[in-house]
Amino acid sequence: MLRFTEDHEWLRLEGDVATVGITRHAAEQLGDLVFVDLPKVGTTLSKGAAAAVVESVKAASDVYAPLDGEVTEANDAVVAAPETVNQDPEGAGWLYRMRLADPSSLDALMDEAAYAALPK
């Protein structure tokens, strides 16, 4: 199940763990990424709180926690090679995984059709 936020983050749910990243639109708007800072495993995130930072040649941007939960994994590959986020933002360029405090809260986020209709 793929869901999106208005802040241009995506989540893919597998069981009660969501993989989180930024959308292709966000990656294109940022330009070439040169730095990624991810949350540490075990960090408890609250919806709307800054969870990660992506920095490009244009700007630095916070990536917000889309829902409440605990970080279970960080994608160290994008820390070592930030350009992976630009090349495959909704695949190999994922940022972190989190165990959702309430998996049903995912229903409040947008599906692909609703995200596609969002003014950009």
Curated annotation (Swiss-Prot):
Coiled coil: none annotated. CDD domains: GCS_H. The keyword ATP-binding does not apply. The modification N6-lipoyllysine is found at K58. Its cofactor is (R)-lipoate. The glycine cleavage system catalyzes the degradation of glycine. The H protein shuttles the methylamine group of glycine from the P protein to the T protein. This is Glycine cleavage system H protein. It comes from Methylobacterium sp. (strain 4-46).
